[in-house]
Amino acid sequence: SLLQFNKMIKFETRKNAIPFYAFYGCYCGWGGQGRPKDATDRCCIVHDCCYGKLAKCNTKWDFYRYSLRSGYFQCGKGTWCEQQICECDRVAAECLRRSLSTYRYGYMIYPDSRCREPSETC
């Protein structure tokens, strides 16, 4: 669920997802278009593509089980959808952590009107 994804992001990056990632670049937050602006934005398009493969799942609201072991998230047992959603979120949160050094505050609230290049495909 988005609530759980927010918790993963906060743990991995020490940043609250809403102000720091909800409107970042061309792909973080709802939807996306154009080319990713940087590594952080690329994490978001990969997450969008991951969710896109789960069209039959309720990706935004389906709760899943996960735990934290030795500083890493581990997805738990559940339905196929729950496990896949958890993996999408886990991989994206870890990607955002790896991208922290290139995070640009100028992309934090980025207007969609600046995302007009041809969109990348999954």
Swiss-Prot record:
PROSITE patterns in alphabetical order: PA2_ASP, PA2_HIS
Cofactor(s), by name: Ca(2+)
Disulfide bonds: 26-115, 28-44, 43-95, 49-122, 50-88, 57-81, 75-86
EC number, UniProt record: 3.1.1.4
Expression (tissue specificity): Expressed by the venom gland.
Keywords: Calcium, Disulfide bond, Hydrolase, Lipid degradation, Lipid metabolism, Metal-binding, Myotoxin, Neurotoxin, Secreted, Toxin
Span of the signal peptide: none
Reaction catalysed by this enzyme: a 1,2-diacyl-sn-glycero-3-phosphocholine + H2O = a 1-acyl-sn-glycero-3-phosphocholine + a fatty acid + H(+)
Gene Ontology BP annotations: arachidonate secretion; lipid catabolic process; negative regulation of T cell proliferation; phospholipid metabolic process
Compartments where found: Secreted
GO molecular function: calcium ion binding; calcium-dependent phospholipase A2 activity; phospholipid binding; toxin activity
Active-site feature positions: 47, 89
Binding site for Ca(2+): 27, 29, 31, 48
Family label: Belongs to the phospholipase A2 family. Group II subfamily. D49 sub-subfamily.
Job of this protein: Snake venom phospholipase A2 (PLA2) that induces myonecrosis and edema upon intramuscular injections in mice. In vitro, causes a potent blockade of neuromuscular transmission in young chicken biventer cervicis preparation and produces cytotoxicity in murine C2C12 skeletal muscle myotubes and lack cytolytic activity upon myoblasts in vitro. PLA2 catalyzes the calcium-dependent hydrolysis of the 2-acyl groups in 3-sn-phosphoglycerides.
Protein name in the entry: Basic phospholipase A2 Cdr-12
